[in-house]
Structures are given as structure tokens and as C-alpha cells.
Amino acid sequence: MHLALTIPKILIRWLIYLSLASYFPWLSAQENNQFSLDQIINYIEYDAFYSSSGQVNEDDLEKLKEAGFNRIIYIAFNDPKRALLNEDKLVMGLGMKYFHIPVEWNNPELTDFMTFAAIMQVQPKKRTLLHCQVNYRASVFSFLYRVIYNKENMATAKLDMERIWKPNKIWREFIFEVLKSYQLSPDCDACDWS
């Protein structure tokens, strides 16, 4: 008898959930997309409009589109061994914008960052994924963008970057160069750059 009462309660709860999910589709889609997006290499969501990650695959692009992303920016080289073949066509075929800025691993340049920032500033509220191979380049660009343009706390942005990696000497110097060009210091209370 107890089982007979439990089944209708479960059924009622399930029907309520289904009716709410159909009325508010984001209830179920958001849970599924977030789980799916977390499967992308080193995926970090900084806010509702901006995320970074490592290399995506074709399935990831479809999940990103379903999750409401409008723009994909790729900042590594189109190496056939590591990059997604025809990523530009795949992204655009899904109705998203695609930008490619090949940033040299051993020689990132201020103009690379400025190009990225210019793309972001055209439509800052366009949901964007910035990615490279493993989210090393992208996490540095994200740190810089968040500090310079979003005026976020440097220590907080640095902690997010260090969830992925501690930048090596080349990338630390790049960070310092970019910050200096925007008249900002890399020094903060909780910032140890060693």
C-alpha cells in the first residue's frame, strides 16, 4: 500500500517538472548544457557572457550553440594535429561568429591582445567562448580582459587563471607588458608572480 501511494507522488512530481520545463525551457536545458560544457577541456565560465577553454570538438560546438553562445574566438594556430579541422566553417554553419587570432606560444604580442579586446568591445554582451589548445593562452587573455576592461579584482582574476596554470616567464612578461600599456601595475595584495 505504501508503494501505491509513492508512485502517484513521483508521477505527479515528474509531471509538474515536465510542465515547468516546457513552460521554462531553460530549466532543463541549462542543467544539461552546463554539465556538457564542463566536459570541454579546462572550461571556465567567468560570467553569463564570457568563458574560456582548451580545444573544442564538433560536439562541443553544438553544445555551445545550444547553451546560447554567439561568438567563438580561437587564439592558437590551426595545427592539423591539435586543432579542429574547419572549425571556422563548423562554427559559422551553426550560426555563430568565428574569429581567429594566431598567437605564437613563445612570442605573444600586445597587438594580439588588443585585437582580441577590440573584437570583444564591439559587442561585450555577446556570449563568447575564447579558446586555445589547453586554455593557457586563453586564461591569460581572460585575466587581462577581466582586469583591464571589466575592472575586476586582479587577485580574483589571477586565481581563476591559476586554476588552469601559473604562467611561465614568457607569459608573465607578456602580462606585465600588457598591463603597463594600459597604465596598470601587476602588484596587488594577494598577487605573487614568482
Locate predicted features:
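Glycine-rich nucleophile elbow surrounding the catalytic serine of serine-hydrolase chemistry
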Residues: 136-140
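Cys-dependent protein tyrosine phosphatase-like superfamily
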Residues: 26-128, 141-194
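Bacterial N-terminal signal peptides
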Residues: 14-23
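Short, surface-exposed ligand- or partner-binding patches at beta-edge/loop junctions that are enriched
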Residues: 131
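Bacterial N-terminal signal peptides that target proteins for export
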Residues: 3-15
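Intrinsic disorder/low-complexity segments
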Residues: 5, 22-23, 118
